[in-house]
């Protein structure tokens, strides 16, 4: 079990925020709206079992970014109705970063994208070898972990994946 003290988390968050600001990248913290507000993060991402988007918005204020995990059209619509700025939908593929997940199939992903007016980001097992299978779904981006951090050269992997994502989204 990994445990980090609140002060360690706060210090690390401030360091990450500084790097993100330097490169013009929004900094969102997963499942910790209070910490996000405390360190001046740009936003928070919450899961279905975490606080509601409305609660996160109350903590972050009107300008904070609130992302919500969704797996069904119903969850997506509810998140949008409660003020989510974007949805993270998935896992869309089998992934090593989340155990015991059943992937959201392409048709459901497409239905979610059609059902909401906020950006949808596909997450979970997304990488260079399967990215193209998400084309035409309506997503507006992807979130990745292993596609970058499992690579020997993270910077090169990020550049390559970004190029591939941009090409896929252009259609």
What is each model feature region?
Residues 1-2:
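Short, small-residue-biased leader/transition segments that mark boundaries at the very start
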Residues 6-7, 128, 151-152:
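Loop/helix-junction capping segments adjacent to catalytic residues or to phosphate/diphosphate-binding pockets
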Residues 9-28, 48-71, 100-128, 161-170:
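Alpha-helix-loop-beta-strand connector modules within alpha/beta enzyme cores
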Residues 12-15, 36-37, 89-91:
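A generic short-segment signal for beta-strand/edge and adjacent turn/coil regions
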Residues 27-42, 56, 71-83, 115-122, ...:
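Catalytic cores of alpha/beta
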Residues 34, 91-92, 103-105, 125, ...:
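Residue-level preference for alpha-helix termini and adjacent loops
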Residues 39-41, 46, 69-114, 153, ...:
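Glycine/Thr-rich beta-alpha phosphate-binding loop at enzyme active sites
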Residues 48-58, 88-100, 131-164:
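Glycine-rich phosphate-binding active-site loops on the catalytic face of alpha/beta enzymes
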């Amino acid at each position: 079990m990994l445990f980090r003290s609140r002060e360690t988390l706060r210090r690390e968050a401030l360091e990450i925020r500084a790097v993100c600001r330097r490169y013009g990248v929004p900094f969102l913290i997963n499942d910790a709206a209070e910490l996000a507000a405390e360190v001046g993060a740009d936003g928070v991402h919450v899961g279905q079992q975490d606080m509601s988007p409305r609660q996160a918005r109350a903590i972050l204020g009107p300008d904070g970014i609130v992302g919500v995990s969704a797996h069904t059209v119903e969850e997506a619509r509810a998140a949008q109705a409660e003020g989510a700025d974007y949805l993270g939908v998935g896992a869309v593929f089998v992934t090593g970063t989340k155990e015991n997940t059943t992937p959201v199939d392409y048709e459901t992903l497409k239905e979610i994208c059609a059902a909401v007016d906020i950006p949808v980001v596909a997450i979970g097992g997304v990488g260079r070898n399967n990215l193209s299978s998400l084309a035409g779904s309506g997503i507006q981006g992807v979130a990745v972990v292993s596609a970058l951090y499992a690579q020997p050269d993270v910077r090169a992997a990020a550049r390559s994946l970004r190029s591939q994502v941009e090409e896929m989204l252009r259609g």
